[in-house]
Regions:
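Short, small-residue-biased leader/transition segments that mark boundaries at the very start
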Residues: 1-6
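Short-chain dehydrogenase/reductase
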Residues: 7-14, 59-67, 90, 94, ...
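Conserved beta-loop-beta element that borders a ligand/cofactor-binding pocket
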Residues: 15-51, 55
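Short, glycine/charged-enriched secondary-structure capping and boundary segments
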Residues: 8-14, 42-48, 102-103, 129
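A conserved pocket-lining segment of Rossmann-fold NAD(P)-dependent short-chain dehydrogenase/reductase
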Residues: 45-64, 81, 88
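Residues that recognize and position ribonucleotide moieties
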Residues: 28, 45, 62, 93, ...
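A short acidic, often aromatic-flanked loop/helix-cap motif at beta-alpha or helix-coil junctions
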Residues: 35-38, 60-61, 120-124
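Mid/C-terminal beta-alpha module of Rossmann-like enzyme folds, strongest
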Residues: 70-138, 149-177
């Protein structure tokens, strides 16, 4: 939730929301949770090296796909009755990075395990493989937030809004393999 989360990314979002509310322009806020694709981008090196790196511990991640979030935006834009509302959106079924590694293993037939790193070590690793410092630090910060419950939501607001279940982790992994 942008109301309670303290990560740098969420702080920036709160400032944007406050500016929008002060503008007087009619709005509806879609607070998208984490995107499944954010983690699936790391699947190729995880499959190559047999390890999925992160700093989320066993924190539950209620991610959804870009397509799921886009469907929600389309509904809100095309239907009446959403003005002034704030929607906290997330996937239906939360998972851990250990579970993601296991799903990659199951579907690919290759062994993949999850290795949890400290936030600093994860950021340094991401920088070491070429990510810009700001992005590496934001991703490591988000993972650390996930370890504390910052990427968990069980409200099912997204699936209620789009009128169907959100895309499962298994479906998402299948789509990239």
């Amino acid at each position: 939730s942008s109301d309670v989360c303290s990560s740098d990314l969420h702080v920036e979002h709160v400032e944007t929301e406050n500016a929008l509310a002060a503008s007087g322009v009619p709005y509806a806020l879609l607070r998208n949770g984490w995107y499944t694709e954010n983690y699936l981008a790391s699947a190729p090196p995880a499959l190559e090296h047999g390890v999925f790196l992160g700093a989320a511990g066993e924190g539950k991640i209620a991610s959804a796909t870009r397509a799921d979030y886009a469907a929600a935006a389309a509904k809100v834009i095309s239907e009446e009755g959403h003005a002034g509302k704030v929607y906290e959106l997330a996937g239906d079924n939360a998972w851990t990075l250990s579970e993601l590694a296991a799903e990659l293993s199951k579907q690919s037939g290759k062994p993949v395990t999850y290795q949890n790193l400290s936030e600093a070590d994860f950021a340094a690793t991401l920088k070491g493989v070429g990510l810009p410092a700001g992005l590496a630090e934001m991703l490591a910060d988000s993972d650390t937030g996930a370890s504390k419950g910052g990427l968990f939501d069980d409200s099912r607001t997204l699936s209620k809004l789009i009128g169907r279940p959100t895309t499962s982790l298994a479906e998402s992994v299948k789509a990239i393999l």
